[in-house]
Amino acid sequence: LGDVYKRQRRFSKSIKAVVIAFLILLLLIPMFMIEDMISERGRTQTDAIAEVGQKWSLAQTITGPYINLKYPITQEDNGTKKVTMGNVTLLPDELSIDGQLSTEILRRGIYKVNVYQSELVIKGFFSSEELRKSNVDMDVLQYQRAAICLNLTDMRGLSEQVSITLNDSVYMFEPGMDGRGIESMGVHAIVDLSALKDDRKLPYEMKIKLKGSQSIYFTPLGKTTRVALKANWNTPSFDGNYLPEKREITEKDFSAQWQVLNLNRNYPQVFINYQNASIKDIQNSNFGVNLKMPVEQYQQSMRSTKYAILIILLTFTVIFFTEIMEKTRIHALQYLLVGLALCLFYSFCLLYTSPSPRD
């Protein structure tokens, strides 16, 4: 009888272990449902950020200013001469940007979206040195109808008219690029750049008031590009191809300074007609700052649920060995209730970390 009793106990323990394993697999169902709920909340938050960006202004990337010059190209086709216009793009020798960002929080339902208003002072100078090094015939360039171009990601972010002071003359920008820009979105001004032909430097200065959301980036078009940025935000994430040389982050704000040389990037100062490879190099050379929220609650909730199966397994293991050591019987329903309580805990974690309209 003693041997039969021992075999029955070993058999019942094996059955109990199988039942516990089945319960753990069963509890994966509510955990997957909780993970799906967290993912759905995260997607809704992303949609809310995009919706606010569509109404306020999207993340901004500032590319420019740069000069576009037209020149005639004569081709013969069956004895007939055909004249088309080519493009020469001249990037600045020096590009200096001094920016001040004023951030604020907007709401869409229970979600918070960080937006900003910026004041940017852009200055530097152009010269014809790189033009003379290129294979362009300087005499055929149309200096009197040159274009100063500035590309922006979202034109709705402009808060006032934009002008540029170029060699002591003021020019107003017009909407659109008129087919003369590195990218299609932006503004341009038709200017007289005859001074370039005379080997003179062309100093420029412009001020922009620009709205955006989430982040702001800059393109290092200058032979030397310097950017100094300040903002009343204490959790910046510096992003892009270049990190700031100097940075200071306090409890209330941050400041950062970048310096990028033309040797640090993979495109020249002069483009003869636009090439897709060169444009892609320009687009990939951006740098800037992402204004991160202090707490990404759904990301934290998702991380915690990844450990749920491990927590349930360890809890059931402790209970099972306690049952063996103390020689007591714990019903499978009690295991199930403990597991459901752990699942409920993660549901409460999601509820607790979700923002409320009063936050």
PLM feature spans:
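Conserved small/polar residues in nucleotide/adenosyl-binding loops
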Residues: 1-8, 352-359
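Hydrophobic alpha-helical transmembrane signal-anchor segments
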Residues: 10-36
